[in-house]
Curated annotation (Swiss-Prot):
Protein name, UniProt field: Anamorsin homolog
Lineage of producing organism: Eukaryota, Sar, Alveolata, Apicomplexa, Aconoidasida
Assembly description: Monomer.
A GO MF term: 4 iron, 4 sulfur cluster binding
Residues that bind [4Fe-4S] cluster: 224, 227, 235, 238
InterPro entries for this protein: Anamorsin, CIAPIN1
Family: Belongs to the anamorsin family.
Residue positions binding [2Fe-2S] cluster: 188, 195, 198, 200
Coarse class of the protein's main subcellular location: cytoplasm
Keyword Ribonucleoprotein attributed: no
Length: 255
């Protein structure tokens, strides 16, 4: 079964100590390692088979040193929790810090928690918190538990938000439910003349054409062909007499 927690420290003993300490801190217990001091705790382990105890607890988490991580690659989206025991805060702020924190961020599962343990009252606490946010972690807070400051951050679960339908993906409502269908009208395009109740526009077109044809037939005609030149060239009975000259073929309306 794959382990859900990674502890990064110089030694397995240190990883064991901070793993238990952080579990106590997370559960809100006021005790530290079960009311047992570090010295008596590890001495009791030595007298009762500490190696087997460490091995059994190591089944709860993976352990790597920061040096091992830098010279290898962490699997992406693998751990629910990553706990880093920091003995050199220089590794976690500035360009070097952002690079290391991004590596841990990418190895967390969505909603996974990153925790870094630093000495209390560290002068670099604010810089580390800022670099954690730059790496993509959210909800970055710090808390002091006994002689350790735990700075925690969460990798956001952006995937769950993208699963929701965006407005552009919402199915459109059928338009037929909002707009009534236009009634079907009989077409007279195949008939010899327009229908009495024509709605396709044929009756209007035929009426317009008939008006143009009538005006052309009723227009006066010239017998001499010089009417357009003006009165000096028109005959006595010219219907255009008294009108100004016009261009040949130009339609002139008579009063």
């Amino acid at each position: 079964m794959p382990k859900e927690t990674l502890v990064v420290s110089k030694s397995e003993e240190l990883a064991f100590e901070y793993f238990l300490s952080f579990n106590k801190f997370s559960s809100g217990s006021s005790s530290f390692l079960g009311q047992v001091t570090k010295a008596s705790f590890f001495s009791s382990l030595a007298s009762s088979g500490s190696k087997s105890s460490l091995n059994s607890l190591n089944n709860e988490f993976d352990h790597l040193s920061l040096y091992e991580i830098k010279n290898s690659s962490l699997e992406t989206e693998k751990y629910k929790t990553i706990l880093v025991v920091c003995d050199n805060t220089d590794e976690f702020y500035g360009e070097k810090g952002l690079s290391n924190l991004t590596l841990f961020h990418n190895s967390l599962l969505p909603n996974g928690k990153f925790v870094i343990a630093i000495p209390p009252n560290s002068s670099h606490e604010q810089e580390i918190k800022k670099e954690m946010m730059y790496s993509g972690l959210i909800d970055v807070v710090s808390s002091v538990y006994y002689f350790t400051t735990f700075i925690t951050g969460v990798r956001p679960n952006w995937k769950s938000k993208t699963d929701k339908k965006s407005p552009s993906m919402i199915d459109a409502a059928p338009i037929d439910g909002y707009i009534s269908k236009a009634p079907d009208y009989e077409s007279c395009s195949t008939k010899p003349r327009a229908c009495a109740n024509c709605t396709c526009g044929r009756a209007e077109r035929e009426k317009l054409n008939s008006t143009d044809l009538t005006s052309d037939v009723d227009a006066p005609t010239s017998s001499c062909g010089n009417c357009y030149l003006g009165d000096a060239f028109r005959c006595e009975s010219c219907p255009y007499k008294g009108l100004p000259a016009f261009k040949p073929g130009e339609k002139v309306i008579l009063d």
